Amino acid sequence: MRPQMRWKLCWENELELSDHTELAEFFRKTYGPTGTFNARPFEGGHSWAGARPELRVIGYDAHGVAAHMGLLRRFIRVGDADLLVAELGLWGVRPDLEGLGLNHSIRVMYPVLQQLGVPFAFGAVRHALYKLVGRLCRNGLGTIVAGVRVRSTLSDVYLNLPPTRTEDVLVVVFPIGRPMSEWPSGTLIERNGPEL
């Protein structure tokens, strides 16, 4: 039986301290099983890990935060083309609800993406999430773009690390204002900022 979900769409400025605290706990529990390093950014009430989202879709059930997706509009470079996108990140579904939340969160976010007038939305996830993201892309809602790496700046400066990192991740593109055929070709996406 599917749990009753209540969805909240909110701009970052609308979140209260209690919202950030609850979201930080959600992310620690959701990302923690993938490694303690992945949960560390959410210590101290941080509800973001790299770049801070401007808009969030948060799903709640009787037990609190159940699912989350953040959005940040930015220009990226794909090959030689600069492109305005809505980056989707901070994707999460509480472990006991896996298979139920992400599809619903993109469906809640999709009309907002259309209102924002962006040509594309894109996200980057670990290859281990291929099956989950594949379900999200069924029916032509999105496309998994293979063979693309993403270069980002680190969210903090470390004297012992280079200022950028290039990752081999799974890139997912959602055509919003333009058809998928207009997504630029290229094997490298330059975020020109930290990941969301």
Curated annotation (Swiss-Prot):
Its EC number is 2.3.1.-. Gene3D superfamilies: 3.40.630.30. It comes from the Bacteria. It is an enzyme of class 2 (transferase). Keywords: Acyltransferase, Cytoplasm, Nodulation, Plasmid, Transferase. GO terms for molecular function: acyltransferase activity. GO terms for cellular component: cytosol. Belongs to the NodA family. N-acyltransferase required for nodulation. Acts in the production of a small, heat-stable compound (Nod) that stimulates mitosis in various plant protoplasts. It comes from Sinorhizobium fredii (strain NBRC 101917 / NGR234). It is found in: Cytoplasm. InterPro entries: NodA, Nodulation_prot_NodA_CS. The keyword Transmembrane does not apply. Its main location: cytoplasm. This is Nodulation protein A.
